[in-house]
């Protein structure tokens, strides 16, 4: 099994240039010959097409290569691949925002130092306190899934038994519920 040779755009472009030169000369010769022939034919429906299939294909490929060459940057064989890459990289870098322009456009600010923070010494370990996070636990069970629903039910049954065992609830159930609801609201 033979390995197919890969062709690059450069190779295709070079081949099309040589083909276009040959096809241009062939087309000129055909035009000269056609000019000498008479246009009269007995049956015009039997008259053969003057443009062959190969010529149509060549014209189509030439038109495409011309459009392709005009749309791209200079991809002629005179420019190296590294130079093309460098030009593209520089064009991309020009589109990126520059930090100098950003710093010029930002308003200037003065450093405001809080007097209470300035009094705090960084080496003072005795005054540091544990700060409890206010973020809610992200590991709560999902009530829409079966396992999460089961976990919630076990937690609620434990809470229910704890509430029933609570002496405050036994003495006045409504005041205990009111306190529990207020406590839940504060926790949230």
Curated annotation (Swiss-Prot):
Residues 1-16 have a biased composition (Basic residues). This is Ribosome biogenesis protein SLX9. Belongs to the SLX9 family. Signal peptide: none annotated. It comes from Debaryomyces hansenii (strain ATCC 36239 / CBS 767 / BCRC 21394 / JCM 1990 / NBRC 0083 / IGC 2968) (Yeast). The keyword rRNA processing applies. Residues 27-44 have a biased composition (Basic and acidic residues). Residues 1-89 are annotated as: Disordered.
